[in-house]
Design a protein with these regions (language model features):
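Terminal transmembrane helical anchor/hairpin motif
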Residues: 2-26, 135, 142-209
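Transmembrane helix boundary and interhelical loop/hinge segments in multi-pass membrane proteins
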Residues: 45-64, 78
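Secretory targeting signals
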Residues: 1, 19-35, 76-137, 187
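Long, hydrophobic alpha-helical segments
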Residues: 27-53
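Hydrophobic/aromatic residues in alpha-helical transmembrane segments
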Residues: 43-47, 95, 127-128, 205-206
Length: 212
């Protein structure tokens, strides 16, 4: 709302409304950017009890005794987080839809690209949190562990910036940079593959943990 007010004030003073969609969604204080910045703080609270609660309550024994495999258990937990992510994206889409109704020449491509980037980021966070939650029966430990990993992946691109080789590696591994490109309106197959690899890797680790 503040950004819309600033843009309206600038328009009143005779300045251009240029790149309004980019400013409102992907700018430094844009909607998608703010969601991206705080998502890694919020996701550990959602994922910390996915498996650790099963351990602490003893219900994991019932799951082992039921006719389901470890793969089914992990994929079922992950599917619930994917559905939650769709609900969150639906809420954001309502805001985007409102912007499309009130803004002339709204950048739908950029908006949908940003939603895709946030959804893939949420799925990656969920897979990481699910894996960490499978390592311990203590929910707080799982939450803190997930937060540490997500924070490291978000700020990894700030490490070793004075060395070109290290800078290239940390940039490639930094998860926020991948979603940031999509929020900016650029969908690259490399970024999509990156998220797919992260999700597959941590889900596989979680399945191996249950099988051990």
């Amino acid at each position: 709302i503040d950004l819309i007010g600033e843009q309206a004030q600038a328009n009143t003073l005779g300045y251009s409304w240029g790149f309004l969609t980019a400013n409102l969604l992907g700018g430094m204080r844009g909607l998608f950017t703010v969601v991206q910045q705080y998502l890694y703080l919020y996701m550990p609270l959602l994922t910390m009890s996915l498996m650790s609660r099963e351990y602490s309550s003893g219900s994991i024994k019932l799951l082992y005794a039921s006719p389901v495999t470890s793969t089914h258990i992990i994929l079922g937990k992950f599917l619930s987080m994917m559905l939650y992510g769709l609900v969150l994206m639906g809420v954001l889409f309502v805001m985007v839809l409102f912007g499309g109704c009130v803004i002339d020449n709204f950048g739908w491509g950029e908006a949908l690209s940003g939603l895709l980037g946030l959804y893939l980021l949420l799925c990656a966070y969920a897979a990481i949190g699910l894996f960490v939650s499978s390592l311990t029966s203590y929910q707080v430990v799982a939450g803190i562990g997930t937060l540490v990993i997500l924070a490291a992946l978000n700020y990894l691109n700030q490490v070793g910036q004075s060395y070109e080789f290290v800078r290239d590696i940390t940039y490639w591994l930094c998860i926020s940079g991948r979603s940031g490109e999509m929020i900016a309106g650029l969908i690259c197959s490399e970024d999509v593959i990156y998220f797919a690899v992260v999700v597959a890797m941590f889900l596989s680790l979680a399945i191996l943990r249950l099988n051990s």
